């Protein structure tokens, strides 16, 4: 029986996705985003920095879906978009969120952003009562109450995005 020997300096998990694919639209790049495996094979003493671990852990909750007995909720970080640049609608059994803004100047140059998200709604969500709120810190909250029936308020419709001046700390559970 052969046993594969793995060197300690090469134990870096190869499955970690790069921040290029995360939801940090235009937040800048780090060296390990462009060359993720070069630094782990060069030095046997290389370790992740504490700052990198913090960034990876802060990824959770960027888009969060909650469904309990009474309501269905979606939390989405859209801090780079204003309510006028967001379009939220219910189409068939999905809630769709689109955001788009033109070219703007930031610290790194010029950037334009666009995204499209779709979330399947449970069959007992009252689609006619779905609301959408954007908090002051850029957290979009979509809330739909659940009803006893299975076909309440079905159909395509646009949902207005209302602005809330309070910050939203609910998703970090």
UniProtKB/Swiss-Prot annotation:
Residues the record lists as binding Zn(2+) 2: 108
Binding site for Zn(2+) 1: 101, 103
Positions with biased composition (Basic and acidic residues): 153-167
Modified residues (N-acetylmethionine): 1
Subcellular location: Cytoplasm; Nucleus
Signal peptide annotation: none
Domain sHSP stretches: 53-164
One Gene Ontology cellular component annotation held by this UniProt entry: cytoplasm
Subunit architecture: Heteropolymer composed of three CRYAA and one CRYAB subunits. Inter-subunit bridging via zinc ions enhances stability, which is crucial as there is no protein turn over in the lens. Zinc coordination is achieved at least by His-101, Glu-103 and His-108. His-101 and Glu-103 come from the same molecule within the oligomer, while His-108 residue is provided by another molecule. Can also form homodimers and homotetramers (dimers of dimers) which serve as the building blocks of homooligomers. Part of a complex required for lens intermediate filament formation composed of BFSP1, BFSP2 and CRYAA.
Family of this protein: Belongs to the small heat shock protein (HSP20) family.
Known function: Contributes to the transparency and refractive index of the lens. May act as a chaperone, preventing aggregation of various proteins under a wide range of stress conditions.
Official protein name in the record: Alpha-crystallin A chain
Gene name tied to this protein: cryaa
